[in-house]
Regions:
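A short, Lys/Arg-rich alpha-helix, primarily the initiator
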Residues: 1-20
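Short, charged recognition helix plus adjacent turn
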Residues: 9-10, 34-35, 61-68
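Short amphipathic helical patch at the helix-1/turn junction of helix-turn-helix
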Residues: 12, 37-40
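Alpha-helical residues within the helix-turn-helix
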Residues: 12, 23, 51
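Short alpha-helical DNA-recognition segment
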Residues: 15-33
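Residue-level recognition of specific faces of alpha-helices
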Residues: 31-34, 45-48, 59
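Short, basic-rich loop-to-helix N-cap that marks the start of a DNA-contacting helix
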Residues: 39-51
Length: 68
């Protein structure tokens, strides 16, 4: 399973909000909803997040193996 928990931690550390993502990254509210629900987003969205937050993928996404 893909988790965006690191994204929210990175945003908090940087003082960024979802509004920041919408304005600076041109990320739609529906995409933010998908991120909050740990649903799939495009690689273009991941790239935009990295640019807006000046971070790497490891700072916004993590892979959690499915349980047995």
């Amino acid at each position: 399973m893909i988790s965006y928990a690191p994204l929210w931690a990175t945003m908090e550390k940087m003082g960024a909000t979802t509004y920041t993502l919408q304005v600076k990254g041109e990320i739609s509210s529906s995409t933010i909803r998908r991120l909050k629900a740990n649903e799939s987003v495009s690689t273009n969205t991941l790239e935009a997040l990295c640019k807006v937050l000046n971070c790497t993928l490891n700072d916004i996404i993590e892979y959690l193996p499915d349980g047995p």
